[in-house]
Amino acid sequence: RFLTKQDVDAFTMAKPLFMPRADGVSALVNSAALRLAGITKATPDPEGGRFDRNEDGEPTGYVLGNAMKPFRTILPDDTDDYLKDNLIQGLKANAAMGWTQTQDAGMSYRLVDLLKTIHQEGRMTHRVYVAVPVSEAMERFKRGREKTDDDFLDVRGIKVFIDGTLGSRGAALIDNYADSDHNGFMGRTPKSTLMPILHQALTDGVQIETHVIGDRAVRSLLDWYDEAFNATSR
């Protein structure tokens, strides 16, 4: 089963808890976090996400997809120094394992700019290939592809999320999950948001990387791709 607020409230009463799952598309929050974010029984599920609820309709503290956004917005912001140090430590750890290149699908431009500084300081230990999140797609079109002469940093693509994951019961299926009363969710990136980005990406030659797992989500996305290809002259 998935953890709920009842599993953690007893020892986290004084502090809000936001604990993302390893897949990054679901999280556990405690009662303090629910109160701070203003999430109640009456709060509707957002497009592209859902609040898991008990039989009485109360949020259990397990949140998926875009239902994580209210909690992410109230998290304290990290400093640039903290983020830069984490990037440097990550680069060192990767190099120590013999990795010569990594890919980050969804790295914000804030982190990209910090990586540029690290590169200028001569502290890049391996190549990094970047796709920025779909929320920063317009900035990607504005900046264009950014690539260092030594190939250590290549900012090229745009990362899109359509549904959740099978493990979190968030991937959008045609039928309900065998152990749940729902079939997942779509809309993490709504069609109305995605189509103009697809058209621009096809026109500019920008790579699109799409997270799409469930059969219902895959069918929809392929239709959208087809629509974008047919509407865009190349």
Identify the function of each model-found stretch.
Residues 120-125, 148, 228-234:
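Short helix-capping segments at alpha-helix termini
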Residues 200, 223-231:
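Conserved helix-loop functional segments at active or binding sites
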Residues 147-149, 154:
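Acidic/histidine-enriched ion/cofactor-binding microenvironments in catalytic or ligand-binding pockets
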Residues 1-141, 156, 160-217:
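Divalent metal-binding segments
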Residues 7-8, 144-146, 230-231:
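Short, flexible, glycine/charge-rich loop motifs used to bind or transfer phosphoryl groups or to couple energy/partner
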Residues 210, 221, 232-234:
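Extended hydrophobic-aromatic, low-complexity segments
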Residues 51, 146-147:
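C-terminal capping/extension segments of zinc metalloprotease domains
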